[in-house]
């Protein structure tokens, strides 16, 4: 049953020709061969399996034996079969989905219908196998047991041979049943895995088709691709099973009516009544799950945001606020999960309850009508109802699967019908033109009413293009462009860019500048096709490269981030590294360019991240370069080097669009655009704009005046000229040196780093298969979390009471029949009949009837109580584990987050929490019900027919050998599946964060290919795990079939001293046990596998080492500390993690109260590490920091961090409102908030928003520009009113004007504070009292800026000269 041949999938696109039957099912037909002696050595052994091997899972035996002898790893398991792969199945599902959309439209399209078409052939084959299984299952209990029990009553020797033949027939039917059931599951598992990989790939491809994600959150994406795809996997497994129930009902009803009479219909009716009840409960469960999932999405999204922004949260000591938020969401989620759990638990309890009610009702009615009842008839009916019970027992699985699948399909359809808007970017007609915008008005939102069709819109664009081309290519002044605001129709969204018109010819450099929020980044986004075009034309030619304002770095090494899928060329690569100023950085890294980078580049500085992003663009060697402020995060010297060597030289001949706040670079641009409020304010060459003396000229004069004409300092013209001359001399020396090298035939890049072999896992700690093995500590932790041992014991007792009541009712019936036979029994034509009429007349036997009915009521009562208590207990456990793990992670140091991928943590809080909340309780409940039933069956059989225990003991050795192999193998397979899931999660998260970059470089296919590879790897291990469960189940079934055969022989050949009811009871129970025991062991193993999630959570609880939240030493801290803000470093050394180099080495410096200190130095010199040290995000290796003469290591972390304020390099905004982002703790009034917004020049911007302070902030603050985000962060800092302020390049994303205003605000607002300013633009530190110059983690200069500037050979003077030289 292999399915579609991957090499024939392409034929599916040929809609005109249907493939022949042989073409479509060739691999499946080969599998139908009973045995295939000549193996083709396929990548996966299942593809070489014949029918017998496929049905019995024998192809898996080598893997199970290997798992027993050796530890399994991701690399040692065979890959997923090509027929089950993402690539093959996603293509096929995509075609079916496209056909559905084309046929009925997106609104009426049914994803469920498409899923049915995708797998209907395999489902029908599965149903056929299940029907054959059901026929065999019904044949044994209904016909053969009845015949055996009838022959048992006849002691004549002539019947012994017939009895033995009946026993052999019973063994044959049971064995055939087992074989067909195994075949059905073998088909089902491959069907389910194909559906899972196909749907998840289709979802990911659709999400990746968007250039920006605004319609779905990151949390929802993770939930859909993990939990929802698994829900569809389970649905494909269990949904076909109920199709056999009607056939079973008919067979059992007919035969029961035949042997018992019309009263048998009572029991059948009971089953039929409960089926619609289960359907109603399924709908109810679906509604509760739908509500719970929406809250789960919110929790996962908030958790993802928390983990992404953990550094800022720790610095601001906001952990408690976020913990309260997530705990509140979790409480809401738990309430909804409780309701779904009650319904689900009721569904699980229905099988034993319905069976007991049906049997008791049938026999009570039969006896009440004074009809004759014999032991063979009674126990044949019981055996038959037990077969029906197993069929009903699968309904909870199917009902749960349908309920969750319906929710999942609805969520998936919502994603699939959301189509990315058509590209509005056209090709310029002039081959010399690379970029052209003609009266382009763009918005971030889609228009509400699109009255024009696509063709009409395209025609209009062409018309506008032709009409305005002559005007654009002329030398006319464009001063009138972009002034008038476009008229918009009612219902159209607000435009962000208005009437933008400009042309960029091939090989030209266009500089774009403007204030914060003027639309610079939006213009880059417009050129990338990420916005919505309302009118006008946007045309671009040639492949492009894009450097985003906030660098996107993925988990891998430096080289992988630079190459980004391109082939490695040594010379080109070395040149790229040189021109991007990365040589020294790579030489300082432990493994050079093979050094592993954490997620989002956590172990790199902002400047290093930005230059790696730039190197990626340079190495790509594209025709068009869109650079969104790439030089703000680097110091002046590196900035000059990058601009000169990279942008002016390496990219010479390329077309470059450079957005920058560093106006000194604009002089070298061929053309400059000044944006204001989304419109072009001025446009022309630098010289032309300076001559016009407009806004641009004023900005440039302000910049120069700010840098060199400040009356407070001594920077005069002579000094500037001196600095220029010294810099020019250094540049000339460098040129001469490089010339000498060229004369000698050497490469100009002399500092070429050497390739070295790096270990695979340097930073990110990998999950090993040994981690997560379930130990007793896990069960202990779970039991304590659920309320303790007493609560767990009481819950366990409820299971035994419920199932004990069910088993008791059957035993009591046998006792009743024995009692009746003692009163009056007579042989009647080869059977013993009891005259129940006379039995009922005896008052003693009224008690039997009452107790029999009471047993039914007790099953019902205990079932209801069990459902409520078990649901509450398991949810208490999962919530307790969630909160404990979250609290542990929150209190972990930053080194933990540096070495633990966010994807792995999100795996814990999404998929693993789903396992603990929903799947573990479901499997555990079924296991406990089955286990308690097995115990009572064994007890009753031991009492009524002890010889059975001898048979079971004889096969116990084989059973334990099988269990030992199975248990080891299934545990390891589950571990490997868990481990392979984390990289998959990380790739999803990283891809969603880097959509813009992925599209710009046209790497969507590479990203999808990697997703498919990771998806296939995880799905392969999931398939192996599930197949291992069935491998064991089949072999257990065969062992129990042997036991059933032996017991049937013993019943046939046993002494007459054993009553007929005892024999009937034993035979009906051994048939029940033969199926129940393997189900019990398998469900127990699945439950233990689900406990792996609890083990992984426990590991975090036990291994996460908290930060030193309390002080190291005993010390007293004044109440108003710090009152002055004096900071002293004494021989301070710091490293980020053990066995890593020092990042701060022997710092000794004193900063007086109220001083402003500018911290400068090359990228990676240790500037940002100073902030980490002050906030104790990293504990010192040695040395001390004193604030107001108090050792900060003697102060609690929360107290320390609340007294300091940090404005980070990368602005961080949270999903919520503007007010929440400014004041998460809600401790300030609106007036105070408006006041700080006014001081940071954001009041007008917020006032324009409809809901003002309550205005929505989207994920990552995407509805604000980077500069606006930074200003909001500045406002947030002003509210804290701290004595010590650290600005980590806080104004890097601001234009010079806003920067100047903000600097004056900082000077005024923090005039009594100690302010440390880390900056790359030196104008931000020239007014500081002191300048601290750092290099390689050491202080190389610390003095007044004017003193350092007067020394031409000082490091600060060199940096200043580099900026002046620009």
From Swiss-Prot:
GO molecular function: ABC-type transporter activity; ATP binding; ATP hydrolysis activity; ATPase-coupled transmembrane transporter activity
Binding site for ATP 1: 514-521
Tissues where this protein is expressed: High expressed in testis.
Polar residues: compositionally biased ranges: 474-493
Domain ABC transmembrane type-1: 123-404, 792-1089
Residues carrying sugar: 439, 837, 978
Stored InterPro entries: AAA+_ATPase, ABC1_TM_dom, ABC1_TM_sf, ABC_transporter-like_ATP-bd, ABC_transporter-like_CS, ABC_transporter_C-like, P-loop_NTPase
Superkingdom classification of source: Eukaryota
Record keywords, A-Z: ATP-binding, Endoplasmic reticulum, Glycoprotein, Membrane, Nucleotide-binding, Repeat, Transmembrane, Transmembrane helix, Transport
Main location: endoplasmic reticulum
Regions crossing the membrane: 125-145, 160-180, 235-255, 257-277, 349-369, 377-397, 788-808, 850-870, 943-963, 1038-1058
Gene3D superfamilies: ABC transporter type 1, transmembrane domain (1.20.1560.10), P-loop containing nucleotide triphosphate hydrolases (3.40.50.300)
Residues reported to bind ATP 2: 1161-1168
Alphabetical list of Pfam families matching this protein: ABC_membrane, ABC_tran
Membrane topology: Multi-pass membrane protein
Recorded family membership: Belongs to the ABC transporter superfamily. ABCC family. Conjugate transporter (TC 3.A.1.208) subfamily.
Role summary: Probable transporter, its substrate specificity is unknown.
Protein known as: ATP-binding cassette sub-family C member 12
Organism of origin: Rattus norvegicus
């Amino acid at each position: 049953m292999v399915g579609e041949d991957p090499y024939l999938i392409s034929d599916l696109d040929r809609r005109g020709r249907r493939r022949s039957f042989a073409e479509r099912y060739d691999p499946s037909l080969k599998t139908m061969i009973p045995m295939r002696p000549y193996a083709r050595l396929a990548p996966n052994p299942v593809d070489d399996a014949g029918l017998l091997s496929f049905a019995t899972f024998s192809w898996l035996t080598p893997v199970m034996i290997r798992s027993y002898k050796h530890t399994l790893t991701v690399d040692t398991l065979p890959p997923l079969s090509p027929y089950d792969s993402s690539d093959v199945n996603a293509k096929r599902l995509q075609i079916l989905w496209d056909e559905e959309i084309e046929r009925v439209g997106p609104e009426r399209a049914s994803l469920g219908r498409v899923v049915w078409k995708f797998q209907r052939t395999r489902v029908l084959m599965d149903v056929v196998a299940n029907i054959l299984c059901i026929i065999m299952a019904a044949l044994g209990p209904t016909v053969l047991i009845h015949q055996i029990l009838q022959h048992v009553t006849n002691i004549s020797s002539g019947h012994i041979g017939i009895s033995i033949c009946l026993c052999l027939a019973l063994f044959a039917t049971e064995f055939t049943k087992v074989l067909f059931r195994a075949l059905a599951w073998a088909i089902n598992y491959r069907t389910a895995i194909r559906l899972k990989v196909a749907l998840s790939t289709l979802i990911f491809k659709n999400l990746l088709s968007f250039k920006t994600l605004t319609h779905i959150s990151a949390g929802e994406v993770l939930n859909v691709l993990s939990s929802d795809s698994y829900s569809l996997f389970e649905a494909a497994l269990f949904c076909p099973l109920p199709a056999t129930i009607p056939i079973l009902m008919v067979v059992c009803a007919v035969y029961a009516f035949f042997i018992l009479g019309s009263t048998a219909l009572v029991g059948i009716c009971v089953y039929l009544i409960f089926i619609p009840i289960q359907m109603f409960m399924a709908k109810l469960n679906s509604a509760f799950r739908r509500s719970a999932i929406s809250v789960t999405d919110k929790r996962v999204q908030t958790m993802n945001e928390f983990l992404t922004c953990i550094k800022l949260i720790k610095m601001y000591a906001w952990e408690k606020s976020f913990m309260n938020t997530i705990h509140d969401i979790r409480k809401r989620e738990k309430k909804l999960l409780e309701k779904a759990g009650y319904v689900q638990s009721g569904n699980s309890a229905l099988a034993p309850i319905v069976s007991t009610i049906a049997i008791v009702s049938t026999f009570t009615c039969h006896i009440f009508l004074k009809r004759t009842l014999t032991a063979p008839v009674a126990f044949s009916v019981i055996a038959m109802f037990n077969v029906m019970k197993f069929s009903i027992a699968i309904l909870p699985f199917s009902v749960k699967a349908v309920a969750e699948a319906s929710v999942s399909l609805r969520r998936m359809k919502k994603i699939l019908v959301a189509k990315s808007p058509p590209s509005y970017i056209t090709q310029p007609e002039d081959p010399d033109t690379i970029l052209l915008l003609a009266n382009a008005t763009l918005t971030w939102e889609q228009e509400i009413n699109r009255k024009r069709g696509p063709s009409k819109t395209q025609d209009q664009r062409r018309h506008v293009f032709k009409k305005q081309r002559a005007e654009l290519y002329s030398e006319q002044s464009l001063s009138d462009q972009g002034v008038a605001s476009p008229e918009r129709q009612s219902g159209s969204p607000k435009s962000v860019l208005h009437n933008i018109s400009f042309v960029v010819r091939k090989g030209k450099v266009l500089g774009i500048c403007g204030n914060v929020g003027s639309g610079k980044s939006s213009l880059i986004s417009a050129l990338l096709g990420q916005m919505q075009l309302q009118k006008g034309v946007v045309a671009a030619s040639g492949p492009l490269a894009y450097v985003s304002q906030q660098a996107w770095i993925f988990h891998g090494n430096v080289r992988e981030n630079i190459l980004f899928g391109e082939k490695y060329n040594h010379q080109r690569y070395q040149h790229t590294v040189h021109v991007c100023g990365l040589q020294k950085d790579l030489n300082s890294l432990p493994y050079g360019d093979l050094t592993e980078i954490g997620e989002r580049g956590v172990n790199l500085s902002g400047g290093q991240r930005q230059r790696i992003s730039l190197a990626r663009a340079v190495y790509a060697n594209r025709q068009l370069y869109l650079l969104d402020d790439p030089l703000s995060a680097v110091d002046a010297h590196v900035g000059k080097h990058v601009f000169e060597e990279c942008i002016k030289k390496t990219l010479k001949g390329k077309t470059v669009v450079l957005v920058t706040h560093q106006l000194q670079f604009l002089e070298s641009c061929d053309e400059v655009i000044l944006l204001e409020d989304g419109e072009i304010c001025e446009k022309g060459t630098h010289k032309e704009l300076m001559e016009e003396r407009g806004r641009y000229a004023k900005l440039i004069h302000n910049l120069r005046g700010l840098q060199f004409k400040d009356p407070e300092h001594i920077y005069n013209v002579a000094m500037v000229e001196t600095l220029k001359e010294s810099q020019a001399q250094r540049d000339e020396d460098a040129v001469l040196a490089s010339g000498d090298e060229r004369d000698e035939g050497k490469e100009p890049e002399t500092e070429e780093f050497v390739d070295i072999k790096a270990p695979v896992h340097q930073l990110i700690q990998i999950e090993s298969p040994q981690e997560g093995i379930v130990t007793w500590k896990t069960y202990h932790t779970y039991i304590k979390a659920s309320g303790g041992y007493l609560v767990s014991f009481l819950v366990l007792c409820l299971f035994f009471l419920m199932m004990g009541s069910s088993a008791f009712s059957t035993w009591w019936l046998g006792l009743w029949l024995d009692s009746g036979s003692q009163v009056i029994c007579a042989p009647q034509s080869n059977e013993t009949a009891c005259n129940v009429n006379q039995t009922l007349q005896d008052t003693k036997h009224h008690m039997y009837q009452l107790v029999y009915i009471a047993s039914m009521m007790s099953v019902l009562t205990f079932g209801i109580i069990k459902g409520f208590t078990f649901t509450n207990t398991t949810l208490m456990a999962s919530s307790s584990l969630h909160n404990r793990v979250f609290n542990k992670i929150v209190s972990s140091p930053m080194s933990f987050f540096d070495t633990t991928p966010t994807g792995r943590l999100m795996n814990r809080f999404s998929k693993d929490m789903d396992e603990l909340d929903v799947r573990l309780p479901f499997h555990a409940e079924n296991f406990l019900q089955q286990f308690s039933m097995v115990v009572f069956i064994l007890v009753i059989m031991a009492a009524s027919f002890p010889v059975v225990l001898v048979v079971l003991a004889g096969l116990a050795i084989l059973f334990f050998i099988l269990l030992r192999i199975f248990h080891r193998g299934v545990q390891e397979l589950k571990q490997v599946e868990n481990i392979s899931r984390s990289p998959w999660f990380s790739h999803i998260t990283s891809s969603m964060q880097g959509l813009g970059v992925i599209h710009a470089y046209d790497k969507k296919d590479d990203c999808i290919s990697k997703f498919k590879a990771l998806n296939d790897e995880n799905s392969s291990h999931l398939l192996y795990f599930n197949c291992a469960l069935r491998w064991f189940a089949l072999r257990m079934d065969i062992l129990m079939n042997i036991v059933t055969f032996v017991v049937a022989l013993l019943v046939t050949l046993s002494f007459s001293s054993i009553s007929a009811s005892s024999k009937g009871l034993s035979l009906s129970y051994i048939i029940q046990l033969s199926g129940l025991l393997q189900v019990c062991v398998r469900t127990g193993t699945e439950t233990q596998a689900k406990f792996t999630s609890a083990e992984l959570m426990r590991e975090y609880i036990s291994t996460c080492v908290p930060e030193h939240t309390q002080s190291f030493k005993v010390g007293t801290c004044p109440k108003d500390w710090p009152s002055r803000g004096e900071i002293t470093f004494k021989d301070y050394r710091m490293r980020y993690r053990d066995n890593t180099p020092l990042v701060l080495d022997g710092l000794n410096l004193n900063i007086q109260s109220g001083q402003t200190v500018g911290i400068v130095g090359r990228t990676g010199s240790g500037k940002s590490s100073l902030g980490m040290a002050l906030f104790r995000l990293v504990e010192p290796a040695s040395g001390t920091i004193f604030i107001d003469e108090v050792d900060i290591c003697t102060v609690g972390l929360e107290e320390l961090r609340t007294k300091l304020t940090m404005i980070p390099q990368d602005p961080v905004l949270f999903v919520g409102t503007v007010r929440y982002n400014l004041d998460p703790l809600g401790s300030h009034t609106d007036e105070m908030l408006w006041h700080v917004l006014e001081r940071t020049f954001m009041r007008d911007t917020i006032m324009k928003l409809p809901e003002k302070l309550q205005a929505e902030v989207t994920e990552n603050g995407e509805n604000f520009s980077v500069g606006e985000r930074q200003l909001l962060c500045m406002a947030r800092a002003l509210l804290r009113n701290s004595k010590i302020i650290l600005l980590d390049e806080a104004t890097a994303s601001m234009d010079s004007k806003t920067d100047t205003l903000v600097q004056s605000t900082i000077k005024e607002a923090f005039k009594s504070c100690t302010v440390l300013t880390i900056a790359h633009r030196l104008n931000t530190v020239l007014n500081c009292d002191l300048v601290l110059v750092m290099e390689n983690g050491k202080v190389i200069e610390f003095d007044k800026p004017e003193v350092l500037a007067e020394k031409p050979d000082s490091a600060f003077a060199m940096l200043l000269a580099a900026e002046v030289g620009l």
